Amino acid sequence: MTLPAATVIVVSRHRAAELARCLMALAQQDHPQIEVIVVADPAGIEAAKATGLPLKLLHFDEANISAARNLGLSAAAGEMVAFIDDDAVAEPTWLSRLCGALARPDVVAATGFVRGRNGISFQWKACEVDALGLDHPLPDDATTYPGAPARAVKTQGTNCAFRRPALLSIGGFDPAFRFYLDYADVNLRLAGHGLTAVVPDAQVHHGFAASVRRRADRVPTDLHEIAASIAVFLRRHAPEALEAETIPAIEAQRRRLADLRRARRISEPEAERLAASLAAGWDDGMARPLSPLAALVPTAPGFMALPETGPRRGAVISGRIWQRAALMKQARIARAEGRVVTVICLAPSPRAHRVAFTDHGIWLQTGGLFGWSTREGPRLRLAPFTRRIAEETARIAPLRPVL
């Protein structure tokens, strides 16, 4: 199957190092015809330039991710347009899997699964979102779903793709959503245009880097924009819910604060400050002007292909923890040859496994020979080294090349 040309849009602000790593992973995609647009602040633009990759670079330094995405969308030239966060890295097969699902003419959107900070456990799978902004889990199968104005498949913001003409026609992203629920709003507005595909094997790793709104451990530092977006979402999609005594999505945030306080992850003054930001954000969202969304006008000067993407050979390099320096040296040589490289470096221990994408563009899996990787089944895995390497190689083979 010939894959349609695709544009990947990455919005970045105050995360230059993470952006560079994200772009390095995109350069290893097996999709043969992609362009990458970076919409970023000055530091992000400089980090993108330093990669040496031919990228469309758009300067944007405002705290409004929807407006930034619209800027990138207008400049996109691919038939399909995909989005990934700057603190995420994509498996080499990610984009081709999403675009493969979009090759069906009745599919207008596609979303995949997201692995969390340990690089193995899933952070997000498939779910629907309703008009109240609440999520509802879906089966893990690869399938397509029709949508409705009050309920649609939720495309995860760090792992999704759309038919560009369809997304342009609905006005792209609503700038009233400066952060949070921006994709849920798109999903409900796009629901009548076609099916949404759930593609479990289209995977990214999402690190949840620190930002102005959260710490590196995912504890929030400000809830203003979350509350504002909840208010805007209800005004757009369920205005009758504003008359209710309680707002479920706001109550969920209050429970979140209570849970964090009980776990002693935030202090009482921090909890009070976060609660105040939640209330102020709600008032802001209720007062925020809402304008009709007109179709976006494309401004793309032409398709700027990222060179040397497409299918390539892989390599799995394995060894013991005391061999790590030699393994990484071997991996850098294989990477310089153009391969997608995975290093599996194990210690004689029961430590759980982790996977990371290094600054050298190498997939590094570490942990104990007897530790679990998938967080399923027994924690202690009694297996000889060669069998364990074979098992882990088989686990990753559907996602990235191993030979």
Each language-model region and where it sits:
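Short aromatic/hydrophobic "clamp" motif used to bind/position activated sugar donors
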Residues: V81
